[in-house]
């Protein structure tokens, strides 16, 4: 680094002189064109390499940033496509769930209607059986009352007719009946 500074000091001394100050020398022979060309060559060679290096680094940085931006854009496009696909799948799934819910509700409705109809038919059967049972009980009670009344009337008649004349007449008719069947 010191050699570079020494070289630069020597070049400035050669080009600008010692204390004359900075100014434009219009005399071509005094300006030492060779020294100027050397200084310009050194500046261009050192500065050019540094400038070229800076420009190359900047170019590589810009290219890397562009590649990274392209990669991010591709990733964003892929994520967007995946999100759209997921949205379509979710919408399809939601539609299927709505349709399935409608179908299930209709099935439940039909099942409830059938069950209500079956319950009504069963209740109608129970009602008819109850009516038949009540009719049978009523008929049984009426029959028992008729029989009891008939027996009561027969007893009454037997008691009324149980006098001795009736017994004599029944006994005589039974004797006559058995005498016909002598063996």
Curated annotation (Swiss-Prot):
Keyword terms: ATP synthesis, CF(0), Chloroplast, Hydrogen ion transport, Ion transport, Membrane, Plastid, Thylakoid, Transmembrane, Transmembrane helix, Transport
GO cellular component: chloroplast thylakoid membrane; proton-transporting ATP synthase complex
Subcellular location: Plastid, Chloroplast thylakoid membrane
InterPro entries: ATP_synth_b/b'su_bac/chlpt
CDD domains: ATP-synt_Fo_b
GO MF, any single term: proton-transporting ATP synthase activity, rotational mechanism
Superkingdom of source: Eukaryota
Keyword flag Nuclease: no
Pfam families per UniProt: ATP-synt_B
Primary location: plastid
Record's bilayer topology term: Single-pass membrane protein
Spans through the membrane: 33-51
Quaternary structure (record): F-type ATPases have 2 components, F(1) - the catalytic core - and F(0) - the membrane proton channel. F(1) has five subunits: alpha(3), beta(3), gamma(1), delta(1), epsilon(1). F(0) has four main subunits: a(1), b(1), b'(1) and c(10-14). The alpha and beta chains form an alternating ring which encloses part of the gamma chain. F(1) is attached to F(0) by a central stalk formed by the gamma and epsilon chains, while a peripheral stalk is formed by the delta, b and b' chains.
Misc. remarks from the entry: In plastids the F-type ATPase is also known as CF(1)CF(0).
Family: Belongs to the ATPase B chain family.
Functional note: F(1)F(0) ATP synthase produces ATP from ADP in the presence of a proton or sodium gradient. F-type ATPases consist of two structural domains, F(1) containing the extramembraneous catalytic core and F(0) containing the membrane proton channel, linked together by a central stalk and a peripheral stalk. During catalysis, ATP synthesis in the catalytic domain of F(1) is coupled via a rotary mechanism of the central stalk subunits to proton translocation.
HAMAP family noted in UniProt: ATP_synth_b_bprime
Listed name of the protein: ATP synthase subunit b, chloroplastic
């Amino acid at each position: 680094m010191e050699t570079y500074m020494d070289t630069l000091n020597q070049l400035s001394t050669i080009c600008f002189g010692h204390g004359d100050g900075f100014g434009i020398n219009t005399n071509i022979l005094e300006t030492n064109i060779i020294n100027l060309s050397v200084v310009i060559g050194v500046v261009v060679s050192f500065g050019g390499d540094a400038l070229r290096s800076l420009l190359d680094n900047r170019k590589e940085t810009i290219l890397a940033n562009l590649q990274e931006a392209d990669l991010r854009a591709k990733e964003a496009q892929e994520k967007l496509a995946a999100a759209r696909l997921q949205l379509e799948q979710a919408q399809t799934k939601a539609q299927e769930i709505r349709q399935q819910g409608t179908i299930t509700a209709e099935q439940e409705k039909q099942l409830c209607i059938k069950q209500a109809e079956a319950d009504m038919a069963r209740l109608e059967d129970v009602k008819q059986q109850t009516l038949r049972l009540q009719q049978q009980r009523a008929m049984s009670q009426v029959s028992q009352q008729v029989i009891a009344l008939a027996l009561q009337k027969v007893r009454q008649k037997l008691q009324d007719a149980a006098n001795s004349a009736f017994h004599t007449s029944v006994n005589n008719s039974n004797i006559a009946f058995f005498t016909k069947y002598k063996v």
